[in-house]
Swiss-Prot record:
GO terms for molecular function: 4-hydroxyphenylpyruvate dioxygenase activity; metal ion binding. Fe cation binds at H219, H301, E387. It catalyses: 3-(4-hydroxyphenyl)pyruvate + O2 = homogentisate + CO2. Residues 45-200, 216-376 form the VOC domain. This is 4-hydroxyphenylpyruvate dioxygenase. It is an enzyme of class 1 (oxidoreductase).
Length: 442
């Protein structure tokens, strides 16, 4: 773990960073991708996503059922945790944790919390502002103390100093954007079930046979008020590099738009896109709508990789009206009639027909192909949603001779942005129409 500072020293030190160069968007056509291998600490992978919610039991079960992610571990009253209830659902390398507080009046010991950074008062403020939302994007790093100290030394705002969970696991957090934290976890041995303090969920209660083919988190997208300061802040303390860039001219519609930058780690398997709204369009940007309903910056959507998007979508759509997730409206038939001209022969006629039947969007870049689809918002507010994707192509061989897929293969759906915007705009119009009708009736 290396030499550690005291918690007071770490939390008070936020300083020796120099101001980065002024951020400026150049647009998709002028952007030149390069990987400077500039990470300031060793990042292994996305480890988990933590949601804060009012009811962890039922929210975790909905995501489990809707996404095909068995409930595998828990930390709650039954395990001795009197501070919060947390439930872990998992599919292959994708882990979601759902956390809700117990009453502080019944808490016997704050030391019983499995996630030591959890705060009941912080939760209540978070939930009142954001509703169901992502609290933490967790990265597995080689060394938590080194990652935290390197981040804070370069300007990261500390949220929770390094804590030793047991003699072989550590956790720390820094602020990312809004009320979202970037969590660092590391293990001195092979990781067990999850974090210390979690116990396995056995038997039929775990839905052990659920598997719709979802395998990992591809990217976690944040919406922010202003892109430049946030990009500079995150790049500054992580060392992550710009992987892709889009402006309103690249991806907007006649009615609304956004600017977007994707940040990536050295291996380009941890991808953090960031969006800002644009102004002066006919309609309010959907990014601005998000910021208003979320009361500030936050995670807009999570892109989940499927090994077979057709199977995943068939299973998810079966459950859309049975407690699962609904999807954004499908593109018009003309979208699929023109698909072969846009993406070539990478998909057969039968696969294109299946894309149309399931409402899947398809795009490609000079390296590979992307299949994608978006759910409607997963909670009461028009904020957080899920994207299901499959990337095709870009296969490489590692030093051990094993094949792997290059990160971000097929891009981020530049060719589908306008189609997605239209579908979101149509969805928002239905909400606005109801609000106008309700106001008139009142």
């Amino acid at each position: 773990m290396g030499k550690k500072q005291s918690e007071a020293e770490i939390l008070s030190s936020n300083s020796s960073n120099t101001s980065p160069a002024t951020f400026k968007l150049v647009g998709f056509n002028n952007f030149v991708r390069a990987n400077p291998k500039s990470d300031h600490f060793a990042v292994k992978r996305f480890h988990h996503i933590e949601f804060w919610c009012g009811d962890a039991t039922n929210t975790s079960r909905r995501f489990s059922w809707g996404l095909g992610m068995p409930l595998v571990a828990k930390s709650d009253l039954s395990t001795g945790n009197s501070v919060h209830a947390s439930y872990l659902v998992r599919s292959a390398n994708l882990s979601f944790v759902f956390t809700a507080p117990y009453s502080p009046s019944t808490t016997t010991s704050s030391g019983s919390a499995a996630i030591p950074s959890f705060s009941a008062s912080g939760f209540h403020s978070f939930a009142a502002k954001h509703g169901l939302a992502v609290r933490a994007i967790a990265l597995e790093v080689a060394d938590v103390a080194a990652a935290f100290e390197a981040s804070v030394a370069r300007g990261a705002r500390p949220a929770s100093a390094p804590v030793e969970l047991d003699d072989q696991a550590w956790l720390a957090e820094v602020e990312l954007y809004g009320d979202v934290v970037l969590r660092f976890v590391s293990f001195g041995r092979e990781e067990g079930l999850f974090l210390p303090g979690f116990e396995a969920v056995e038997g039929t209660a775990s839905f052990p046979d659920l598997d719709y083919g979802i395998r990992r988190l591809d990217h976690a997208v944040g919406n922010v008020t202003e892109l430049g300061p946030v990009v500079e802040y995150i790049k500054g303390f992580t060392g992550f590099h710009e992987f892709a860039e889009f402006t309103a001219e690249d991806v907007g519609t006649l009615e609304s738009g956004l600017n977007s930058v994707v940040l990536a780690n050295n291996e380009e398997m941890v991808l953090l896109p960031l969006n800002e709204p644009v102004y002066g369009t006919k309609r309010k940007s959907q990014i601005q709508t998000y910021l208003e309903h979320n009361e500030g910056a936050g995670v807009q959507h999570l892109a989940l990789v499927s090994e077979d998007i057709f199977r995943t979508l068939r299973e998810m759509r079966k459950r859309s009206c049975l407690g699962g997730f609904e999807f954004m409206p499908s593109p018009p038939p003309t979208y699929y009639k023109n698909l072969k001209n846009r993406v070539g022969d990478v998909l057969s006629d039968e696969q294109i027909k299946e894309c149309e039947d399931l409402g899947i969007l398809v795009d490609r870049d000079d390296q590979g192909t992307l299949l994608q689809i978006f759910t409607k918002p997963v909670g009461d507010r028009p904020t957080l949603f899920i994207e299901i994707i499959q990337r095709v192509g870009c296969m490489l061989k590692d030093d051990a001779g094993q094949m792997y897929q290059k990160g971000g293969c097929g891009g981020f759906g530049k060719g589908n942005f306008s189609e997605l915007f239209k579908s979101i705009e149509e969805y928002e119009k239905t909400l606005e129409a109801k609000q106008i009708t309700g106001s008139a009736a009142a």
